[in-house]
Amino acid sequence: MSQQGTIYRVAGPVVTAVGLNARMYDVVKVGNEGLMGEVIEIDNDKAIIQVYEDTSGVRPGEPVENTGMPLSVELGPGLLTSIYDGIQRPLEVLKEKMGNFITRGVSAPGLSRTKKWKFVPVVKAGDKVKGGIVIGTVQETKTIVHKIMVPPNVGETTIKDIKEGEFTVEDVIGHLENGTELKLMHKWPVRVPRPYVEKLRPDIPLITGQRVLDGLFPIAKGGTAAIPGPFGSGKTVTQQQLAKWSDAEIVVYIGCGERGNEMTEVLAEFPHLTDPKTGNPLMDRTVLIANTSNMPVAAREASCYTGITIAEYYRDMGYGVSLMADSTSRWAEAMREISSRLEEMPGEEGYPAYLAARLSEFYERAGRVITPIGKEGSVTVIGAVSPAGGDISEPVTQNTLRIVKVFWALDAKLAQRRHFPSINWLNSYSLYQDSLKDWYDKNISPEWNQLKAESMELLQRESELQEIVQLVGSDALPEDQQLTIEIARMIREIFLQQNAYHEVDTYCSLDKQLKMLKSIMQFGAYARTALASGVPMSKILNLNSKNDLAKVKFEANYDAYLTKVNDDMKKEFKSLEAA
């Protein structure tokens, strides 16, 4: 058996080679054009390969060459601001080489080999180090300091020598006593999770600036969430909002089998967006992986693993990373196609039996951890799921729900009513509520959890009353129940609805969320007192302060505005009761 074999059979993205000395998950070059592939099954002397490029024109008898290496990514300065495909080929570099259409078999290194980076060591000769220890820093962008680490698979040893200066990622910057050369970059296999010291309890929320998420269904840093929903319900816009505004320091956005137009929107928008915390371009802390639906299906799986490996790398530096995978359903469809080409026994709806194992393998790499340098870092994974026809009982959604702890259920009916984000507050849930309670009590207000519980109760009551309203109309209800419906409507329209394209309303701080909810509940309390003292419901509905309250979401100076609205509200209710 040699490092070179020949093609025996071609079936779409799956190629069978004979006479190849290969191990599982070795990367191979397939055919005369050297298409990149990965060994996924070995049967006696046959190696079954999934090819990450289009196999049109490949025929039996062509050579297959084994690289002897697993599918790996290059980790080092230059990742941020980059746009990659699923196997870490830099699309901008390939465009300069090839034009708008990339020909097959073309490759380019993930990190630039010519750009020089200013390296400042933080260790000296004679210092003891081991895998994951920071040896120096590079100012990668204006926002992010890149920490250069000893590769994680290096045991405990001593620094022999280390240099300061400007280097490319391939230049040797020092040596260890065990003979290891130190460079600004190292490679890591994408299927192997990077090691950490300890996993921490998820008790710090990831602040997203989206009221329905922060207010009702929060996610913790290092948590996992799923956004299932039918077409046109707002999955991609919700993911993009999270990528833009969540308080993670690094964002990895994976377009996994998404429409080309949606990826174009991201690629066109992100470079012009400003990071609200630093005032620098948002791209300075973002890695984009674009793998559109017309690209070969096998690369979809690779794009998810590539993305999470890059996320873990920045986590190891002590950063909070949020990873958006849009959409994991397309990855599952690719798995189904390759599984059928391999003639494996199909599971439910034709998906392979190992669907749940692959999904959990991916989501379980999320977490808030202590890194080898003793710092806290986190990877928060938010995966969109696109069930056919919006049917969330299908296998991908169900298997995802068993793994993730936050479920943001997008609703087509809400989207049709132009209620965005169209997250159904009755179907969604967050299992991080209890672990985050203390954080909200200490850092926001002891009232936060109480207000949230009251608003959820009102929304539940409204749902029950709506069934009666549809039969007999709202006028047939007692006035206190009419008021319940009205306050719930205010919560829905003022608090839960949010305009992603409005410069003020696109992001809402926790302080503003608290004050908005407080004012709505205060209106409800005044209204109940007024009803009890005989004020008719029609007069309460016509108050000016109620209409003014609806405008607060578009006010940048919300504090002064809400103070005025609350004062007006108090006066109006007093004059109603006096009359």
From Swiss-Prot:
It catalyses: ATP + H2O + 4 H(+)(in) = ADP + phosphate + 5 H(+)(out). The keyword Transmembrane does not apply. GO terms for biological process: proton motive force-driven plasma membrane ATP synthesis. ATP binds at residues 229-236. Keywords: ATP synthesis, ATP-binding, Cell membrane, Hydrogen ion transport, Ion transport, Membrane, Nucleotide-binding, Translocase, Transport. Pfam families: ATP-synt_ab, ATP-synt_ab_N, ATP-synt_ab_Xtn, ATP-synt_VA_C. The keyword Oxidoreductase does not apply. One of its GO terms (cellular component) is proton-transporting two-sector ATPase complex, catalytic domain. Its main location: membrane. Its EC number is 7.1.2.2. GO terms for molecular function: ATP binding; proton-transporting ATP synthase activity, rotational mechanism; proton-transporting ATPase activity, rotational mechanism. It is a peripheral membrane protein. It is found in: Cell membrane. InterPro entries: ATP-synt_VA_C (IPR055190), ATP-synth_a_Xtn (IPR031686), ATP_synth_asu-like_sf (IPR023366), ATP_synth_asu_arc (IPR005726), ATPase_a/bsu_AS (IPR020003), ATPase_F1/V1/A1_a/bsu_N (IPR004100), ATPase_F1/V1/A1_a/bsu_N_sf (IPR036121), ATPase_F1/V1/A1_a/bsu_nucl-bd (IPR000194). Belongs to the ATPase alpha/beta chains family. Component of the A-type ATP synthase that produces ATP from ADP in the presence of a proton gradient across the membrane. The A chain is the catalytic subunit. Has multiple subunits with at least A(3), B(3), C, D, E, F, H, I and proteolipid K(x). This is A-type ATP synthase subunit A. The gene is atpA.
